[in-house]
Amino acid sequence: MATSLRLLDAGPGSLRRWIPTCFAALLLLPPRPNLGYNEDHAEPVCGAPWWSDSLEERHHWPWEVSLQIENEHVCGGALIDQSWVVSAAHCIQGNKEYLVMLGSSTLQPSGSPWALKIPVGDIIMHPKYWGQNFIRSDIALLCLETPVTFNKYIQPICLPEHNFNLKVGMKCWVTGWGQAKQHPSAKLTRSLELWEAEVSIVDNKNCDRVFHKKTFYPQVIPLIRKNMICTTNHRENPCYGDPGGPLACEVHGRWILAGIFSWEKACTKAPNLSVYTRIDKYTGWIKEQVSRGARSGRCRTSCLLFLPWLLQLPVSPGPPHPFLFLLCLC
């Protein structure tokens, strides 16, 4: 017991030299279900979707999820790990029982062998979430009751590093079962099939000026803050995104979760301005909550989520960092 206490009190130590020992120990453990990819032999990496050769499935978004109440779609979300989904905090409606549907691009996946519906076991709202008027810190983590097995149709998207270089004019993609108008006088209708739209990153200051014109807030009060992203598109029906749905940006062949759809100016005409929670401002909080969930036993997590962080720890003599033991058990 004394040894355990001493190790827990140790600071960042020689983690890198302990990693081979940890993985050697992992090889001696019996296999655990629902870990890694299945017989499709896809590599267990984030943000690397399988692209079909068929035109109909050219753009495939395997991290897209549907957050549902009583089997009715209410919001989108993004899978970041075998047990965790990121969505918008304003999607959470009190003590409801939520399901997450994965592995399907349609809201009616009858007969699909890949579609899964998994109950949400725990929900973590960001402590600074503000849902009045212009929403702030609009992010929530959903822990699945059962970890998923990754395959061609269910894969995680990568979390961005802190201060992710998101440039104005950069092209990204928003996906969801959003609403659209077939003509100006028509009612908004939800699509049963997953839609996608390419959007451009807009300068936050310019976006802020546009939103201020529609409100009585003085200019000195920023509506679009540093922890938000603003985008625009030029499609006829701009409302492709779902609240909580992902804004995905491709960087060097890897798809990054840049944002989570939060709110927009209007859903009537293009070009349309949409506002997202900027994920790189919350990456540290996400990893902290995932780590706590793993330690408490509520949610298992994948070691891959923490691997970039582990490799950045300094090398120094002494006992290993206690997080290494969490890595060995995850």
From Swiss-Prot:
Among its keywords, does the record have Disulfide bond?
yes
One GO BP: proteolysis
Where do the record's glycosylation annotations fall on this chain?
N272
Q: Which residues form a coiled coil?
A: none
> In which broad location class does this protein mainly occur, judging by the first location in its UniProt entry?
secreted
Q: Give the GO cellular component terms, alphabetically.
A: extracellular space
**Which part of the chain is the Peptidase S1 domain?**
45-291
Record's InterPro entries?
Peptidase_S1_PA, Peptidase_S1_PA_chymotrypsin, Peptidase_S1A, Ser/Thr_Proteases_Immune/Dev, Trypsin_dom, TRYPSIN_HIS
Which SMART domains does the record cross-reference, listed alphabetically? Tryp_SPc (SM00020)
This chain's protein is named Inactive serine protease 45
- The scientific name of the source species is Rattus norvegicus
